[in-house]
Curated annotation (Swiss-Prot):
It comes from Hahella chejuensis (strain KCTC 2396). Pyridoxal 5'-phosphate binds at W103, T153, D173, Q196, N238, T239. Homodimer. This is Phosphoserine aminotransferase. The lineage of its organism: Bacteria, Pseudomonadati, Pseudomonadota, Gammaproteobacteria, Oceanospirillales. Keywords: Amino-acid biosynthesis, Aminotransferase, Cytoplasm, Pyridoxal phosphate, Pyridoxine biosynthesis, Serine biosynthesis, Transferase.
């Protein structure tokens, strides 16, 4: 579509144009039923079929083992900062958390309201530019689980491997990396992910939880946050965000049509490599993150003169490159390269950056 621009927003992020066109075509009359899917009962046979198919496709894409439940819940990933410790409280009154940036710090602060948090490793001392080596972690023997954030969207720091935490359940906030590459789900106890990066629109959160962890919830856990209750009710304890669930299902179909997460891994690696290579070769732009832990999904960068920041953003928008401003807490620029952002968007961004640098060096 000629009027579609390239959206580099960190979230809510770009959605596949093909998905939006299908949703548009079905908006008023879903598959000849005479009503929108937004108007349909979540307990109707038609919507239940949509929900079941979405879960089946997600399981196939992520190779989710049979002994894991997939939950479609509400509240965003931030709600999971409380849900995780409350659902796992009876594993132990202490948990290990790895601090690699703003989102892991938020998870630490919230969990600290319900149990003792041991910050087993922190990137604070290196300015959150590098993930602490596994040999530096100080895991607690009494911890019930270990939590980490594989990708920090604001700082642009990412774990490129799954950390080994022994027999402790590993919990991960995969909001910004889910579906971007294959993952060995069996290495985890719980994975959660807000939808608005690689899954679909905001309003939905996916939780993957190993079945044997469903019986460890706090007795005071609110019903709507209880993984076991959600599992027993097929994620429909109350009315779910049906439109977000439906759109997520369309995204899963789109991903399968593109070759699945294996194909996305190659594309995403290529997109990130292109942009980092240009930044590293440039004397006008810089990326502060250590080479060993640069994010594929979120690429922060600065200009050599920050007085040019607003000019850069204004001209980029005029060139059809949207939402490149860095997070308000760190400034600078940030290009988010989620699945739905095509490779030509990265090529267009690099072309603009070259032109801007040439005119403002």
């Amino acid at each position: 579509m000629a009027d579609r621009k390239f959206n580099f927003c960190a979230g809510p992020s770009a959605l596949p144009t093909e998905v939006l066109l299908q949703a548009q075509a079905e908006l008023l009359d879903w598959r000849g039923k005479g009503l929108s899917i937004m108007e349909m009962s979540h307990r109707s046979d038609d919507f239940v079929a949509v929900a079941v198919e979405a879960e089946r496709d997600f399981r196939e894409l992520m190779s989710v083992p049979d002994n894991y439940k997939v939950l479609f819940v509400q509240g965003g990933a931030a709600t999971q900062f409380a849900s995780v410790p409350l659902n796992l409280l009876k594993l132990g009154a202490e948990a290990d958390y790895i601090d690699t940036g703003i989102w892991s710090k938020k998870a630490i602060a919230e969990a600290g309201r319900y149990l003792k948090v041991n910050v087993a490793a922190s990137a604070k001392d290196n300015g959150y530019a590098c993930i602490p080596a596994r040999s530096e972690w100080r895991l607690s023997e009494s911890a019930g689980y270990v939590h980490y954030t594989p990708n920090e969207t604001i700082g642009g720091v990412e774990f490129l491997d799954i950390p080994d935490v022994g027999d402790k359940p590993l919990v991960a906030d995969m909001s910004s990396t889910i579906l971007s590459r294959p993952v060995d789900i069996s290495r985890f106890g719980v994975i959660y992910a807000g939808a608005q990066k690689n899954i679909g629109p905001a309003g939905l959160t996916l939780v993957i939880v190993r079945e044997d962890l469903l019986g460890y919830a706090s007795d005071s856990l609110p019903t709507m946050l209880n993984y076991k209750v959600a599992s027993e009710n097929d994620s429909m304890v109350n009315t779910p965000p049906t439109f977000s669930w439906y759109l997520a299902g369309l995204v899963f179909k789109w991903l399968k049509g593109k070759g699945g997460v294996q194909a996305m891994e190659a594309i995403n690696c290529r997109k990130a490599d292109k942009l980092y290579s240009y930044i590293d070769d440039s004397e006008f732009y810089a990326n502060p993150i250590d080479l060993s832990c640069r994010s594929w999904m979120n690429v922060p960068f600065t200009l050599k003169d920050d007085r040019l920041d607003q000019k850069f953003l204004q001209e980029a928008e005029g060139a059809g490159l949207l939402n490149l401003q860095g997070h308000r807490s760190v400034g600078g620029m940030r290009a988010s390269l989620y699945n739905a952002l095509p490779e030509e968007a990265v090529d267009a961004l690099i072309g603009f950056m070259q032109d801007f640098a040439g005119r403002n060096a």
